[in-house]
Curated annotation (Swiss-Prot):
Annotated Gene3D superfamilies: 3.30.70.120
Keywords assigned by UniProt, alphabetized: Chloroplast, Nucleotide-binding, Phosphoprotein, Plastid, Transcription, Transcription regulation
Name of the featured protein: Nitrogen regulatory protein P-II
GO BP terms in the entry: regulation of nitrogen utilization
Keyword Phosphoprotein: yes
A molecular-function term among this protein's GO annotations: ATP binding
Cellular compartments annotated: Plastid, Chloroplast
Gene name in the database record: glnB
Originating species: Porphyra purpurea
O-UMP-tyrosine found at: Y51
Subunit-level organization: Homotrimer.
Similarity comment: Belongs to the P(II) protein family.
SUPFAM superfamilies (alphabetical): GlnB-like (SSF54913)
């Protein structure tokens, strides 16, 4: 199993979510995050002074999938989240050793 973490633009969340549901995911976790990277922040003016805001709000989506679904799910995210501009985000893929559904004690794929 793999954990897919995607950092995307907030306005892309609904489009990405709908495409992922169509693609067969059973659920996902969504977290509001902030950070910086190559995307430059914005310059604001306050009381005559300019200052730079370089921490940008983003959305992080976390999905656990079987190994055979990793490519199709990442392609869906790329296709729907991409604008072609700096700041579109990143996808991180890592191994998941075990998943346990708390309510039923189901393990791994049965817990997804």
């Amino acid at each position: 199993m793999k954990k897919i973490e995607a950092i995307i633009r907030p306005f892309k969340l609904n489009e990405v979510k709908l495409a992922l549901v169509k693609g067969g995911i059973g659920g996902m976790t969504v977290v509001k995050v902030s950070g910086f990277g190559r995307q430059k922040g914005q310059t604001e003016r306050y009381k005559g002074s300019e200052y730079s805001i370089d921490i940008i709000d983003k959305i992080k989506i976390e999905i656990i999938v079987s190994d055979d679904k990793v490519n199709s799910i990442t392609e869906i995210i790329i296709k729907t989240a991409k604008t072609g501009e700096i700041g579109d985000g990143k996808i991180f893929i890592s191994d998941v050793e075990q998943v346990i559904r708390i309510r039923t004690n189901d393990l791994n794929s049965a817990a997804l």
